[in-house]
Amino acid sequence: MILQRLFRFSSVIRSAVSVHLRRNIGVTAVAFNKELDPIQKLFVDKIREYKSKRQTSGGPVDASSEYQQELERELFKLKQMFGNADMNTFPTFKFEDPKFEVIEKPQA
């Protein structure tokens, strides 16, 4: 009888504690999201700016025409070297078993 009451009481406490912890975790997430340092804020702003530039350009950010031409040349070389294969997949290899010649040993 006492054990049953104890188990009921412990389950009530456990549920109350879990609700309390969930609320505290939500509050601490907001507190940790705050940018305290001005240098950190500048750094995060630059990263966001770079990300938006990269998404709009669809490639490298602030790349000169020489860089783009060099990139195209290197990709062309790779496509020629690997037979116009898809560069994003791992190549498949086909190995054949070597064929050995059977040599008869002379009987001594």
UniProtKB/Swiss-Prot annotation:
Q: PTM N6-succinyllysine: list the residues.
A: K94, K99
Location in or out of the cell: Mitochondrion; Mitochondrion inner membrane
Task: Name the family the entry cites.
Answer: Belongs to the eukaryotic ATPase subunit F6 family.
Under the heading InterPro entries, the entry gives:
ATP_synth_f6_mt, ATP_synth_f6_sf_mt
Q: Which residues get modified to N6-acetyllysine?
A: K41, K46, K79, K94, K99, K105
Subunit comment for this entry?
Component of the ATP synthase complex composed at least of ATP5F1A/subunit alpha, ATP5F1B/subunit beta, ATP5MC1/subunit c (homooctomer), MT-ATP6/subunit a, MT-ATP8/subunit 8, ATP5ME/subunit e, ATP5MF/subunit f, ATP5MG/subunit g, ATP5MK/subunit k, ATP5MJ/subunit j, ATP5F1C/subunit gamma, ATP5F1D/subunit delta, ATP5F1E/subunit epsilon, ATP5PF/subunit F6, ATP5PB/subunit b, ATP5PD/subunit d, ATP5PO/subunit OSCP.
What's an example GO cellular component term for this entry? mitochondrion
Keyword annotations for this protein, in alphabetical order, are: Acetylation, CF(0), Hydrogen ion transport, Ion transport, Membrane, Mitochondrion, Mitochondrion inner membrane, Phosphoprotein, Transit peptide, Transport
One GO BP annotation here?
proton motive force-driven ATP synthesis
* Keyword Transport attached: yes
Q: Does the keyword Acetylation apply?
A: yes
Role: Subunit F6, of the mitochondrial membrane ATP synthase complex (F(1)F(0) ATP synthase or Complex V) that produces ATP from ADP in the presence of a proton gradient across the membrane which is generated by electron transport complexes of the respiratory chain. ATP synthase complex consist of a soluble F(1) head domain - the catalytic core - and a membrane F(1) domain - the membrane proton channel. These two domains are linked by a central stalk rotating inside the F(1) region and a stationary peripheral stalk.
Residues bearing PTM Phosphoserine: S65
Q: What is the extent of the transit peptide?
A: 1-32
Organism lineage string? Eukaryota, Metazoa, Chordata, Craniata, Vertebrata
Q: Name one GO molecular function term.
A: proton transmembrane transporter activity
Q: What is this protein called?
A: ATP synthase peripheral stalk subunit F6, mitochondrial
Write down the species: Homo sapiens (Human)
